[in-house]
Regions:
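Cyclic nucleotide-binding regulatory module and flanking cytosolic helices
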Residues: 1-36, 80, 85-88
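Cyclic nucleotide-binding regulatory domains
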Residues: 13, 38-102
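Cyclic-nucleotide recognition modules
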Residues: 21-22, 73-136
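Short loop/turn motifs at secondary-structure junctions and domain boundaries
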Residues: 23-24, 41-44, 170
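A conserved hydrophobic position in a structured secondary element of the catalytic/binding core
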Residues: 53, 75-76, 108-109, 180, ...
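Polybasic "coupling" helices that flank or enter modular domains
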Residues: 121-188
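Phosphate-/nucleic-acid-contacting segments
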Residues: 163-237
């Protein structure tokens, strides 16, 4: 994977982690460092505690029977995982968690996390807001997957990436502040790398996007006009 975190996005979240309610968790846990591409948690593993991403980006993914990776979501600073274990819905992790950049991860006992959550309404509100953002992101991702045509899948996954990682540029385009290869995008929507490359080139010819190496720029007004989904234009998750 070739993701690179965009600093303007992570600065906001990391400030929340350092100075907001999340800092109440830090005294109860131990921080570990994970190098880029290292697995933080394996599918089927029983986590030893609650994990809080302090800095960096983590990819959540599964592997198909054919051995292909399928990206489920991306986690940023302040996110708590694996949520299914944190809140008692599963004993084991349902997915793999891999560091996309160098990461700092706080590990604390689940009992300490739950006790702090029950006593700290500000922390509870921040976690609620985080999960609502992830829920909105998930619906946008699912909507992209539901389209039958490859180009439509890509248009809607670009819409999701803009909402999650978009940075407006002086020229009016929106930069997706992740370093993305064709393979990375293909894994998000279940396409082959070859099909993804062809369809992205067609979108570039239509001037919906431009890209250089691993950087993507999206013409959001034209993208919205193409999809007719103006309700998504100002979504930020």
């Amino acid at each position: 994977m070739e993701f690179t975190a965009g600093a303007p996005i992570l600065i906001v979240v990391e400030d929340r982690l350092r100075f907001g309610a999340f800092r109440t968790l830090q005294s109860a846990g131990v921080t570990r460092q994970f190098a880029k591409r290292r697995t933080v948690l394996f599918q089927g593993e029983i986590p030893r505690g609650v994990l809080v991403l302090e800095t960096g980006l983590v990819k959540v993914y599964g592997i198909t029977n054919g051995g292909d990776q399928r990206t489920v979501t991306l986690l940023g600073a302040g996110d708590i995982f694996p949520v299914e274990c944190v809140f008692g819905m599963s004993r084991v992790s349902l997915y793999y968690y891999e560091a996309l950049t160098d990461c700092s991860v706080l590990n604390l006992p689940r009992d300490a996390f739950i006790a702090t959550l029950e006593q700290n309404s500000h922390l509870k509100d921040q976690i609620f807001q985080s999960y609502m953002a992830h829920y909105t992101s998930a619906t946008m991702h699912i909507y992209a997957l539901e389209h039958s045509h490859a180009q439509e899948k890509l248009v809607y996954i670009l819409q999701y990436l803009v909402a999650r990682f978009g940075e407006r540029q002086a020229n009016g385009l929106t930069k997706i502040s992740l370093r993305l290869s064709h393979q990375d995008i293909a894994e998000m929507v279940g396409l082959t790398r070859e099909t993804t490359a062809v369809e992205l080139h067609r979108l570039k010819a239509k001037k919906l996007i431009s890209y250089q190496r691993f950087s993507y720029y999206v013409n959001v007004p034209l993208l919205v006009q193409t999809t007719g989904s103006d309700e998504f234009e100002n979504v930020a998750v």
